[in-house]
Amino acid sequence: RQMCIRDRLNIEEIKEKGDLPTTQEELRQRRERAETLVKKKSLLSSGASIVPIPALDFGVDLKLMRDIIEDVNKIYGLDHDQVNSLSDQVKERIMSAAAIQGSQFIGRKVSEALLKVVIKDVAKRAAAKQTKWFPFVGQAVSASISYYFMSKLGKDHINKCEKVINNL
């Protein structure tokens, strides 16, 4: 199923580590390529958070985080050790994973809070008709949060790779 979605989003498969960029133009091209990859995989992450299967989004997000980091490294022609020597990446991965896992919980809490406000402000009959929309609101919030954190993780990693290259 993921292959079908991956094909629809036209996500580039990065098979081999490239050479190090030697000019600013090559660096700019690598950034564009990496940012496109991060955007598409972030969309995939947000899509997984919409599916109402417990822990599915968490498993997909863990795989996507690993894939994004490995693919961005390959795009820039770097290996894991070169990038990790710059900062404490493991701590950031754990925090990102926790944030993404929490996105579904936050979405539910936002939905519950919205439901309480509507019930207080609108007659019970009207509120009862509107409650059917709240699961969708929670899923939309969850998807937005998941996209944001996955995108942030990818962009931060792109910046780290560029710092490493500029320091070489």
Pin down the residues of each PLM region.
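N-terminal, intrinsically disordered, low-complexity segments
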Residues: 6-10
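Alpha-helical membrane association modules
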Residues: 11-168
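Short, small-residue-biased leader/transition segments that mark boundaries at the very start
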Residues: 1-5
